[in-house]
Amino acid sequence: MDFIINQSLKLVESGLVPDQAIRAAIRALSKKRLIQEGRYDPEQGAQRYMDVLNMLKHSQIAIETDKANEQHYELPTAFFEAVLGKRLKYSACFFPHDRTGLDEAEEFALQIYSDRAQLNDGQHILELGCGWGSFTLWMAERYPNAKITAVSNSATQRQHILSKAEKYGLMNIDVITCDVNVLELQQNAFDRVVSVEMFEHVRNYQKLFEKIQSWLKADGLLWCHIFCHRFLHYPFEIKSEYDWMSRYFFTGGLMPASSTFLHFQQHLELSQHWQWSGTHYEKTANAWLENMDHNAEQLKPLFEKVYAQDAAAWWQRWRIFFMACAELFGFEQGQEWIIGHFLFKKKAV
């Protein structure tokens, strides 16, 4: 069976299979995932949920952190500048209307983040997993008297953010390159800790939240944005040829449930919780794919430089990755896989 799947994937990666057929296959695999994880079987679902929860509690903070860098950031920043929106926001954006464009959707999302995290000028704000600085730079612009400390595991991203900060005259940004497993920061130093789509690369939230609790001031808050499933949580593992996403784009990652954090409140207490429909990510990923296709002429030489003889296959893999994100989060009109926002306060001693 694995041989048949392998040959089918090679055909799909050749670019000969129409996008419509690829999207249909992705929807079928999404349904298969729901069945495997016990979405429609209460007994199986509860057991699977607890098995994963116990695994998380006995894991290190994050695994395969170097692999995540390789899989997403070996392409030069120029690729993401051509594919993402103006802010280089590599995460779900917010589309209040059908006519909303990607650049505008980025701005809507960032403003929502600020409101929900209760950000104010003059605060010391830590961003964990800052990407190319979409939120870090936005906060630095919006709150000139705030001090922004951003953490990324990518030296390339650090260079990009500092270059942009210098260009725009932003003097209130510090960027740290570090693996979250070994990250150590000053205690009681931050008014806010914010994170956008980084906690999906985390396994042991108890250990991470303990660290964050120590970094926050007494009245400090943690706010985070994650993608998640409404009921299920599961790790991305490479067990068979079916596990294409785990192999090429999300090794060591986790699909949290909207309830996963509820089990990790020893150090931080959940104060508020919001959800977005998965259709916002569907629209985001489709916009990225549209930009990639539109800029194919300028981007394909980048792929040839990075991937050499495998350039054509990797071009299609990135296209499939964006289609997979769009179809997964658009599944059942965005009511299965969704976006979660969480606000935590320090637990009373």
Predicted regions and their residues:
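Conserved Class I S-adenosyl-L-methionine-dependent methyltransferase catalytic core
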Residues: K32-R116
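Conserved class I S-adenosyl-L-methionine
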Residues: D121-G131
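Conserved SAM-binding loop of SAM-dependent methyltransferases across substrates and taxa
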Residues: W132-P144
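Conserved SAM-binding motif I beta-strand of class I
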Residues: K147-S152
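Conserved SAM-binding strand-loop segment of SAM-dependent methyltransferases
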Residues: K167-V182
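A short acidic, Gly/Pro-enriched loop at the edge of an enzyme's catalytic core
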Residues: V182-V193
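A short glycine-rich, Lys/Arg-flanked "PGG" loop and its adjoining helix->strand segment in the class I
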Residues: Q206-L221
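Substrate-binding/catalytic lobe of Class I Rossmann-like enzymes that use SAM or dcSAM, i.e.
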Residues: C228, Y234-E336, K346-A348
